[in-house]
Amino acid sequence: MKTLLLTLVMVTIMCLDLGYTLTCYKSLSGTVVCKPHETICYRRLIPATHGNAIIDRGCSTSCPGGNRPVCCSTDLCNK
């Protein structure tokens, strides 16, 4: 009986979604914890009018368009 109970507990633990959330760098500084449906960290360059590009970073549900986007799916991978 103890073996059956232990087996059920182990199966339950393995099947649970433990609510992992991704952490990405954000645009200006620091980090942001992504919403559960945001599974991509991104970094992209946004051209500016006077030649200086702006680096945009954050969380997304898909890889955004733009100039030279870099997309990844592990914590803090968009440095």
Swiss-Prot record:
Tissue expression summary: Expressed by the venom gland.
Residues spanning the signal sequence: 1-21
CDD domains attached to this UniProt entry: TFP_snake_toxin
Main location: secreted
UniProt-recorded Gene Ontology molecular function terms: acetylcholine receptor inhibitor activity; ion channel regulator activity; toxin activity
Localization: Secreted
InterPro entries hit by this protein: Snake_3FTx (IPR003571), Snake_toxin-like_sf (IPR045860), Toxin_cobra-type (IPR054131)
Keywords from the named record: Acetylcholine receptor inhibiting toxin, Disulfide bond, Ion channel impairing toxin, Neurotoxin, Postsynaptic neurotoxin, Secreted, Signal, Toxin
UniProt GO cellular component terms: extracellular region
Disulphide connectivity of cysteines: 24-41, 34-59, 63-71, 72-77
Family note: Belongs to the three-finger toxin family. Short-chain subfamily. Type III alpha-neurotoxin sub-subfamily.
Biological function: Binds with high affinity to muscle nicotinic acetylcholine receptor (nAChR) and hinders acetylcholine binding to the receptor, thereby impairing neuromuscular transmission. Competes with the binding of alpha-bungarotoxin on muscle AChR (from Torpedo) with an IC(50) of 0.18 uM. Causes muscle paralysis, spasms and increased respiration.
Name the record gives this protein: Short neurotoxin 6
Source organism of the structure: Pseudonaja textilis (Eastern brown snake)
Lineage: Eukaryota, Metazoa, Chordata, Craniata, Vertebrata
